């Protein structure tokens, strides 16, 4: 069984060599005190933001190679949907069957509250940012990208990472929650409000 320390020993130097210049060019410290990931499902873009002098700065973007499902939040186990909302990380998995993975804290308190209110007893679980190029409800980033992201999260501390997951970029087009659950406008408004802080 591999440990996080094993992964740092294997991939740390190459990841640092790639990430340090990106952070320096953006005007951010490396490793940062905190980071924000923004995952855009429609655009299949994964943004990495870090604290700058006064405002967050965009450090890097990676393509999302696979994300199953379509627009709309994850509601139940097996629906193949990628979650939407404001999340934190729950840990790092150095022994993933998808090379390496980073666990998202889905379902969070918001998800659990609405699942309980609607009688959904199995809202799903085990949502990861991972390697490889296939996904069922997770974000598949490919192996080279997940090696860098894994090292970045390990160096930053997974408890210092925020994850914003949206159907598309609310900074460019306002939320259109028609046709979803009754609580979807509330969720999208919160996501859009948080995303406003991350603009170049």
Model-derived segments and spans:
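N-terminal secretory targeting signals
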Residues: 1-23, 200
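Exported/periplasmic cell-wall-interacting domains
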Residues: 78-200
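Primarily extracytoplasmic ectodomains and periplasmic/lumenal surface modules that are beta-strand-rich
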Residues: 43-47, 53-56
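N-terminal post-signal-peptidase region of extra-cytosolic proteins
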Residues: 18-36, 48-49, 64-78, 82-89, ...
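Residue-level detector of beta-propeller blades
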Residues: 58-60
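Acidic helix-start/capping segments at beta-turn-to-alpha-helix junctions
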Residues: 42-43, 63-69, 166-171
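Short, flexible beta-strand-to-coil junctions
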Residues: 39-43, 105-107
